[in-house]
Amino acid sequence: MKLKVERVIKNWKYAKKIKIEEGIFNDNGQGRRFKKQSKVNYWKEAFKEFKLTPSKKDSGFLEKNFRGGENYIGNHYLDGACVPEHVDPAPTNCVHVRANLMLKKPSIGGNPIINGKEIEVNENDLWLCLVSIEPHSSTPIQGGERIIFSFGALIKKEDIKNIYELQ
């Protein structure tokens, strides 16, 4: 399986316009927290960077099975936290994709690991992960915290073939 587009958009042009809404984060265990986001701009623009055009009409599955209003999530990872390797669910005919924006990065760690490969990202970088088909995790955070904004969508498998070689 191979991605046919750049995985990371360095210093994404809309990064400084994205903010996590005020409010309380929910505990997700082991120093990981999340907060639903009820409204956000630049959802379409985030996926367009990767030649994807998701439809909001397909967001019902994500709404019921995940944490986000329209499935936008603010994630806050504390010192020592990491994301364990996993693959997320998706309906049979779709791929669950996430365009993640690094809002704050610790001095050490916090990089995504996708398909066993560490991906170097910096603050304001946007990266793509096909979370229902690519095993993914992150490196442990040391000396700070990691804050990301995660845009979620379902993309039909036939549309994913334009950017990813499916087996």
Residue ranges and their predicted role:
Residues V5-R7, E22, P54, N75-D79, ...:
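Surface-exposed beta-strand edges and flanking loops
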Residues L3-K4, H96-R98, I148:
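Intrinsic-disorder/low-complexity, polar/charged segments enriched in Ser/Thr/Lys/Arg/Asp/Glu/Gln
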Residues I20, N26-N28, N71, Y77, ...:
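Generic detector of intrinsically disordered, low-complexity, polar/charged segments
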Residues K105-Q167:
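Catalytic core of Fe(II)/2-oxoglutarate
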Residues Q37-S38, P91, F151:
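Intrinsically disordered, low-complexity segments enriched in polar/charged small residues
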Residues M1-G69:
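Non-heme Fe(II)/2-oxoglutarate
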Residues S59-S132:
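Catalytic core of non-heme Fe(II) oxygenases with the double-stranded beta-helix
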